[in-house]
Design a protein with these regions (language model features):
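Hydrophobic alpha-helical transmembrane segments
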Residues: 1-259
Length: 259
């Protein structure tokens, strides 16, 4: 059974690379994370991962014309690379190994917390730019261009809740979660995404293009190095994702232990 799931992970990584949803490093990391998750949770864990990556990839294709301006702001656009896969799935990999060694239900919930938070954040990032109005920046309390880190819109917030609930409800059917656990997974997922927005506003590094003056997460814009403006220099988008999903999931894990 394990060999079959690993073969499935290999097929998934190859498909993602073939359709340019993953870079080569992203495909390799997908294979590693998927294999670890299948070792801990079997095919059920892989289905949850597939729902996350699949739904996120599909949403990334929606409204591409509107998202072109976002691509010039965000640090990474297009195919997911290895660091992005690790940022979203690294802790899930650890939770799967911990579950395999202990068979402790709390580690299954930890896995779901991580995926729900990642899915909520990704859905918000993909759905938010479809809004007809620019989002509000938590840092300046003014409207900011779509795709700006630390900015929120109504439709993006709806995407956050829907993304977390999607994973929680799917997990209910796959793992027979109780209603309490469904609510908890959804809540932690939303909390993780909101933390990501907050950290993006106050801590994520920001650059400014020396050619057009646009604020961006990219180190290079219009073929020229960008100028550092604010934020913690080592805190890029991937680091924020790891930090916030880990913090939210850790809080959820503590709640499970004492609730």
């Amino acid at each position: 059974m394990l060999s079959a799931t690993i073969l499935f992970c290999l097929l998934l990584a190859w498909t993602g690379r073939s359709f340019r949803l993953l870079t080569t490093s992203g495909a390799i990391m997908t294979l590693l994370v998927g294999s670890g998750v299948s070792f801990g949770f079997g095919w059920q864990g892989l289905v949850v991962l597939l729902l996350f990556f699949g739904s996120s990839s599909l949403l990334s294709k929606v409204g591409r014309s509107r998202k072109q301006s976002v691509d010039s702001i965000v640090e990474k656009d297009g195919a997911r690379d290895g660091w992005q896969v690790l940022a979203n799935g690294g802790l899930a990999f650890v939770a799967a190994l911990a579950y395999a060694m202990t068979m402790d239900f709390a580690y299954l919930l930890l896995f779901l917390f991580v995926i729900a938070a990642s899915n909520a954040d990704t859905w918000a990032s993909e759905i938010g730019p479809l809004s007809k109005r620019d989002p509000w920046s938590l840092k300046t309390l003014r409207r900011a261009p779509a795709g700006t880190s630390g900015a929120m819109s109504l439709i993006g917030t709806v995407g956050t809740i829907a993304g977390a609930a999607f994973i929680a409800i799917a997990a209910h059917w796959i793992f027979s979660l109780s209603l309490r656990d469904v609510v908890l997974v959804t809540s932690i997922g939303v909390f993780g995404s909101l933390l990501d927005t907050l950290f993006g506003a106050v801590g994520q590094r920001v650059y400014r293009c020396t050619v057009c003056g646009e604020y961006t997460e990219k180190r290079e814009h219009h073929g020229q190095p960008t100028a550092y403006v604010s934020g913690i220099r080592f805190l890029g988008n991937d680091a924020v994702n790891v930090l916030t999903s880990g913090l939210a999931s850790g809080i959820g894990f503590i709640i499970v232990r004492f609730w």
